[in-house]
Amino acid sequence: MSAPAAEPQAAPSRPTIGVLALQGDVREHLAALRACGAEPVLVRRVGELEAVDGLVLPGGESTAISKLLQVFDLLDPLRARLRDGMPAFGSCAGMILLASEVLDTRPDAQHLSGIDMTVRRNAFGRQVDSFETDLDFAGLDDGPVRAVFIRAPWVERAGDGVQVLATVPDGPSRGRIVAVRQGNVLATSFHPEVTGDLRVHRMFVDIVRAAGDRAGNVHTPDVQPT
């Protein structure tokens, strides 16, 4: 008697992930998310924010993005979605925006308190102090992550519920925290979207999928990725 045929494996869900498109390196994040099997969309309006399963806050200029969040009436709705458990990923300026406390910023700058952490803006110095290094990143296989730091922040305090994923391995900034996660929210000081290494984005897409599976409401578009 032949063995019963194996049940076909269900295709992974294709979540709709927004990229906050007010300022910064939006296009690179869109491409990385698409390559990881997500459906990336631009987010500039409240209605667009409400329709996504997760959100990327890209690198750019944190105080400019902070102002634009207020101009576009996105600040409070975004805080509310984060409180409700929406997954989010912030790189560089996005890390600053996700912090609960920001040092060396403008007194009128706003932040989202998505992660219980204190972040120092421009901690590594000016544009001329930008650099690259290899990082051991917790939860990622296949060797170190090549990290590009451009006027980057670092984390000076990580709260009790915050998982430290990566620190600077050497040099004058050795031991500084540059990647963290708290629940569904992920943040990096560096720009994974510019190196072609998709592992950090895959980690975030997996976070979004898992959150959607628990809630039973992942948006899976009918269109196929291009």
From Swiss-Prot:
The active site is at C92, H191, E193. GO terms for molecular function: glutaminase activity; pyridoxal 5'-phosphate synthase (glutamine hydrolysing) activity. Belongs to the glutaminase PdxT/SNO family. GO terms for cellular component: cytosol; glutaminase complex. This is Pyridoxal 5'-phosphate synthase subunit PdxT. The keyword Cell wall biogenesis/degradation does not apply. InterPro entries: Class_I_gatase-like, PdxT/SNO, PdxT/SNO_CS. In the presence of PdxS, forms a dodecamer of heterodimers. Only shows activity in the heterodimer. Keywords: Glutamine amidotransferase, Hydrolase, Lyase, Pyridoxal phosphate. The lineage of its organism: Bacteria, Bacillati, Actinomycetota, Actinomycetes, Mycobacteriales. Catalyzes the hydrolysis of glutamine to glutamate and ammonia as part of the biosynthesis of pyridoxal 5'-phosphate. The resulting ammonia molecule is channeled to the active site of PdxS. The gene is pdxT. It comes from Nocardia farcinica (strain IFM 10152).
